[in-house]
Amino acid sequence: MTNFENKEVWFITGSQHLYGEETLRQVANNSKEIVEGLNGSDNVPVKLIHQDTVKSSDEITKVMLDANNSSSCIGVILWMHTFSPAKMWIKGLSIIKKPICHFHTQFNAEIPWSKIDMDFMNLNQSAHGDREFGFIMSRMRKKRKVIVGHWKTEVTQKKVGNWQRVALGWDELQHIKVARIGDNMRQVAVTEGDKVAAQIKFGVEVNAYDSSDVTQHIDKVSDDEVNSLLKKYEKDYDLTDALKDGGDQRQSLVDAAKIELGLRAFLEEGGFMAFTDTFENLGALKQLPGLAVQRLMADGYGFGAEGDWKTAALLRAMKVMAQGMEGGTSFMEDYTNHFTEGKDYVLGSHMLEICPSIADSKPTCEVHPLGIGGKEDPVRLVFNSPKGKALNASLVDMGTRFRLIVNEVEAVEPEADLPNLPVARVLWDPKPDMDTAVTAWILAGGAHHTVYTQALSTEFLEDFADIAGIELLVIDDNTSVRQFKDTLNANEAYYHLFQHGM
């Protein structure tokens, strides 16, 4: 999906010349040991690179410029081992473009009660050094992640690792190219948006292509390639009898394989890591891509149906963040509701395109009619999803800013089998309850398309929104409609002032 080994996070320790060479040598040695310890943790996926201790404005400015200019550096972790007067940091913090993590830790975990003296106190000053540093970043209105805890503890290492994952997702957005195959579904509002503003804000490059750009790759697919992929389908999925070799709809699976091979070749040739399509612009494609899209998502590609490029880009970023973690991440749509006397639920699904990374068992591979698009019956993977904590995330363009909306949910098992539903699905209980959650979602302008994930928590997206400088609205167990409406109104003023530097 993405190679963690090609990326790095710089660990920068602040001090000053006041303390003398011996203290500064100890600061450097301690910093190196912290970096080595974090690099040895399985919870820290991106290699930390120790930088020389910075002790002056010039040194700080230089390392920040170097970080900006490094294509490998995806972020900086800043820690004040001793006191480091914060006015020295103003120029450097003014120019740094990479995500910032302010790490409030200490080399020693405990106070050595019987041995502590002023030498110890002068060396280990992060308790007030980091407060001085925190002030200047708040004074400069710098968005950053603050992590508090001893560097040897697992909980702290996980926090560092999770922030690194968010920085990886952000770095991915700086380089991502999204291919829109066809246009938006006609007359749909929420999938529209300002692609120029998105490129300025996120770095995402979005361009449109015709379905013929894909079909010309399909025409080049060889029989050997198709046969090899068919064998993989037979191994990875439970094929219905109609799709098995000799089945009366085997050709549909052959056509689906050609679509996958051609679409994959198109994406690889163009360097696209996310894409959209729409059933209204299929051209010479024999089927609306279903199986192909599902398998590409499973390989890490971002996808949005009906031209939804914002969800496609967000899905790719979240898949990069979640790489190697337990739980899947998929394109999703709030499809239909289940209102009962007791609990209310939402059934999430789509016409075809749900990622098998969220499957609870080996998917079945089936072919069924599709009443829209005017093409042949498409092949798709069908499955249920596991129960457990999850969230839905929606990125929308509000005209003056981008807004990220997150609803925490609890996936549950369907109350009965769904023998006549020929699509992948997941049933969830929105937090804090159906009434409050959906009311808040609608008030926020949340889309019907989302990214659904069981791998990432809300904290990942909170950190992402801070890095991007975009609005975040969270709907969870603590949400009330009255409070949520107040937040919406307050945010209108805040983001107007924030965007205009007031």
UniProtKB/Swiss-Prot annotation:
It comes from the Bacteria. Its EC number is 5.3.1.4. Pathway: Carbohydrate degradation; L-arabinose degradation via L-ribulose; D-xylulose 5-phosphate from L-arabinose (bacterial route): step 1/3. Keywords: Arabinose catabolism, Carbohydrate metabolism, Isomerase, Manganese, Metal-binding. It is an enzyme of class 5 (isomerase). This is L-arabinose isomerase. Its cofactor is Mn(2+). The gene is araA. InterPro entries: Ara_Isoase_C, AraA_central, AraA_N, AraA_N_sf, Fuc/Ara_isomerase_C, Fucose_isomerase_N/cen_sf, Lara_isomerase. The keyword Isomerase applies. SUPFAM superfamilies: FucI/AraA C-terminal domain-like, FucI/AraA N-terminal and middle domains.
